[in-house]
């Protein structure tokens, strides 16, 4: 009896201290479905099938954008804004917007390349021009920072914000590290629509290698492979 009570107390403490939501029911099924689709995409991208069938081939930047889109979608569904464990409409909305900002790169990649870094503007009327890609880039950067805060914590967000401010206000930095400063358009264009910033080498390595290692490691652990190798090691040393 006391053991059952202790187990329930430990479970409650873990639930309260865990940064993630305890998903159940429909929410759990949705998150699981997204994770499965993400895994299938990564397996397809890493396989030779796209080249064999000449279909579903992804270039570097679009593949990285899709990868980050899945990550943002799951981040806001799994990690809550506060101690509340329920998924709010705001979390769902932010996750959809963040995913859209990433998928925009995939759907309009050729146009982005043709414009050579010039962000698209839409003429709404004679007196109003909507900087659509500037807005998408700003939203994507802000949502990524919020996702980073939820998953990892504030320190990395603070470092990223400091470098963004340094890029924009570089002319006010000490002379040894000062530079001309980037305009908001150039900053957003480089950070969000280029393959050298947010979608640079780290995400490239994640797309090509890290995700697959984590996926197959999780499958191996679930299938009992971890216990098998431990038992094998103990058997080899005679314990």
Q: Which role fits each region the language model picked out?
A:
Residues 141, 158, 169-239:
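Membrane-embedded alpha-helical segments and adjacent helix-loop junctions characteristic
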Residues 89-97, 128, 142-170:
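Membrane-interface loop-to-helix entry segments
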Residues 46-49, 53, 109-112, 116, ...:
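Perimembrane helix-loop junctions in membrane proteins
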Residues 40-45, 107-108, 144, 165-169, ...:
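Hydrophobic membrane-targeting signal helices
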Residues 1-128, 133-138:
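Conserved, well-structured core domains of diverse proteins
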Residues 75-85, 144-149, 222-227:
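C-terminal ends of transmembrane helices
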């Amino acid at each position: 009896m006391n053991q059952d009570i202790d187990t329930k107390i430990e479970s409650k403490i873990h639930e309260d201290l865990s940064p993630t939501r305890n998903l159940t029911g429909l929410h759990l099924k949705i998150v699981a479905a997204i994770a499965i689709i993400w895994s299938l995409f990564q397996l397809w991208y890493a396989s030779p099938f796209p080249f064999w069938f000449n279909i579903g081939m992804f270039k570097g930047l679009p593949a990285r954008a899709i990868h980050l889109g899945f990550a943002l979608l799951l981040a806001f569904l799994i990690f809550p804004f506060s101690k509340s464990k329920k998924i709010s409409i705001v979390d769902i909305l932010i996750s959809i917007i963040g995913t859209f900002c990433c998928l925009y790169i995939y759907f309009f990649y050729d146009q982005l390349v043709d414009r050579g870094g010039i962000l698209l503007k839409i003429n709404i009327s004679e007196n109003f021009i909507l900087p659509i890609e500037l807005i998408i880039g700003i939203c994507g950067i802000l949502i990524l920072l919020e996702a980073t805060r939820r998953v990892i914590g504030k320190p990395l967000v603070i470092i990223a914000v400091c470098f963004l401010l340094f890029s924009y206000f570089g002319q006010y930095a000490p002379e040894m590290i000062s530079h001309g400063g980037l305009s908001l358009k150039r900053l957003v264009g480089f950070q969000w629509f280029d393959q050298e910033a947010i979608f640079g080498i780290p995400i490239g390595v994640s797309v090509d290698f890290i995700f697959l290692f984590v996926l197959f490691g999780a499958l191996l652990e679930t299938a009992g492979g971890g216990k098998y190798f431990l038992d094998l090691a103990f058997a080899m040393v005679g314990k």
